[in-house]
Amino acid sequence: MKRADFCIIGLGRFGMQVAHSLKENNFTLVLIDNDQHKTNTAAQEFDHVVCCDGSNLTALAELQLEEFSAVIVGVTNIEASIMICANLRELGQKNIIARAKNEVHNRVLRTMGIREALIPEKIVGKNLVIRLIHGMETEIINLGNDILFVRAPVNNKKLFNRTLGEINIREHTNANLISIMRNGKDVVFPLGPNTQIQPGDVITAVCQLSGVNQYLRYINPNDKNKYKASE
């Protein structure tokens, strides 16, 4: 498998939502579940589906999951989730994003060194996919009606030391800039046409779900953390 691929373990509602969103963005996926009915259903839509017990270290090792860009663990059973994540860590996979059933489960996963532990009620599958594509440091809040509150660092050098009036991000992306976090602590608000973007700035903006990828690609055209879809 290519380095840009993703693996999803657990084909419940959350796992399948993430799978569909990643597929829409032209990523190659491997889907895993220990339920034959779920894998049979998923195989009707996806090319690479495996019926496998993720808590079985030997079975996971055969899939070479350490070669994937990231593995999303979406199982709901806490014990199974912990065992799967432990197996993935042992196999050398560092980029693990796991669904947490509650705050206790969340803390346990983070104690294990899991890169991201997410409670689905706080972040929906589509928002997770945006973060997978553009970098997990991107923060997404769904305001409803497909309107997103997006907080992300700016890495486009062409924007540095230029004013918002000169750049006119809204014209290029239809996003409305709200504030800028500078030096990790100083907040620039309100923003005006003479406000400059500087290296290291983190911008908060409001935009539509349909335009969020365009906006994030504009402020981070060569983001080293952004995964690229398979050719």
Swiss-Prot record:
<dbReference type="InterPro" id="IPR036291">
    <property type="entry name" value="NAD(P)-bd_dom_sf"/>
</dbReference>
<dbReference type="Pfam" id="PF02254">
    <property type="entry name" value="TrkA_N"/>
</dbReference>
<dbReference type="GO" id="GO:0008324">
    <property type="term" value="F:monoatomic cation transmembrane transporter activity"/>
</dbReference>
<feature type="domain" description="RCK N-terminal">
    <location>
        <begin position="3"/>
        <end position="119"/>
    </location>
</feature>
<feature type="domain" description="RCK C-terminal">
    <location>
        <begin position="134"/>
        <end position="221"/>
    </location>
</feature>
<dbReference type="GO" id="GO:0006813">
    <property type="term" value="P:potassium ion transport"/>
</dbReference>
<dbReference type="InterPro" id="IPR003148">
    <property type="entry name" value="RCK_N"/>
</dbReference>
<dbReference type="InterPro" id="IPR050721">
    <property type="entry name" value="Trk_Ktr_HKT_K-transport"/>
</dbReference>
<dbReference type="Pfam" id="PF02080">
    <property type="entry name" value="TrkA_C"/>
</dbReference>
<protein>
    <recommendedName>
        <fullName>Uncharacterized protein MG323 homolog</fullName>
    </recommendedName>
</protein>
<dbReference type="InterPro" id="IPR036721">
    <property type="entry name" value="RCK_C_sf"/>
</dbReference>
<dbReference type="InterPro" id="IPR006037">
    <property type="entry name" value="RCK_C"/>
</dbReference>
